[in-house]
């Protein structure tokens, strides 16, 4: 759309009159392949000069039909699909799905397995926030912090590789526990990392919050008031930056989070600055949680002993026919949760992540619905961008921290 008003105004006219010489309203495409959109996101942007009048997100470019596919796979097979939605905090999807199925089954997760889940989930949250911090500051024109953030993230990925064998898409959490126990070298290496990380977080906050350039670029930009944030369904750091104290780990505790001591960082203005600062401070809380978890990491089993849920150890397959039968049924037919429906919310790096699962008594879910925080948070983009400048729109997108695999699914 383009509108022009071409009035004959003298070239020596005063500035307030010269502004009316030519006014244009243009609609442009940003994306779907554009570095500032943090994925395959297409934005229809209506501009008046540099001012953003309207932003309409167009999604679906990364749609893979995860939810429908999961309805045609057994509950165990679906574990391979869940980490591929939010590939930056994949442990969050693994955990949320496992908790929902365990609620259907009435499975009992051993204390050691719960603690391992918390440790890996918070490490994954740290890794995700480091990507957010590095790429967010990169969008504001700062190249060096990007390398600083990825330095620590590389250490976390090394820890994941020791435990799961994978740096991404870990497939480590299982229904009723975790795949296997932690390797011997994991805890000592994790403690070394935890000694360094608090100082790094202090450096990140100083680099960001104390920089007058970042302050001018981020403060007062993309403001989302608390009442608007609630109406739009925002969760996670984007909601807490607006001053709303809501964290699923506190409101609806799971995996023993109610027994951990940690704070919920809040913002004051709900702008780009607060959304970035809240996530930096959340990293400190994740370190606190991991340290507490290490102190209570007692020896014990890591899977529910129920043979209907957990396959038998491989060494029993050579001596026990009963173990062979359970093993065969587990990997061919799977288990059959009773009829019912559950919704389990969790706190991912991007906000409330929930799995709604309906069971008809079969070995496959009748319905799976994922409450993905990136999808919900993205709908605040038109409100946050209206009236801002084009370069600020890039910063606003980064501050919402969307993952397009989480949006499209």
Swiss-Prot record:
It comes from the Bacteria. It is found in: Cell inner membrane. Its main location: membrane. It is an enzyme of class 7 (translocase). Gene3D superfamilies: Cytochrome-c3 Hydrogenase, chain B. Its EC number is 7.1.1.-. It holds the Pfam family Complex1_49kDa. One of its GO terms (molecular function) is NAD binding. One of its GO terms (cellular component) is plasma membrane. It is a peripheral membrane protein. Keywords: Cell inner membrane, Cell membrane, Membrane, NAD, Quinone, Translocase, Transport. It catalyses: a quinone + NADH + 5 H(+)(in) = a quinol + NAD(+) + 4 H(+)(out). NDH-1 shuttles electrons from NADH, via FMN and iron-sulfur (Fe-S) centers, to quinones in the respiratory chain. The immediate electron acceptor for the enzyme in this species is believed to be ubiquinone. Couples the redox reaction to proton translocation (for every two electrons transferred, four hydrogen ions are translocated across the cytoplasmic membrane), and thus conserves the redox energy in a proton gradient. NDH-1 is composed of 14 different subunits. Subunits NuoB, C, D, E, F, and G constitute the peripheral sector of the complex. Belongs to the complex I 49 kDa subunit family. This is NADH-quinone oxidoreductase subunit D. It comes from Thermus thermophilus (strain ATCC BAA-163 / DSM 7039 / HB27).
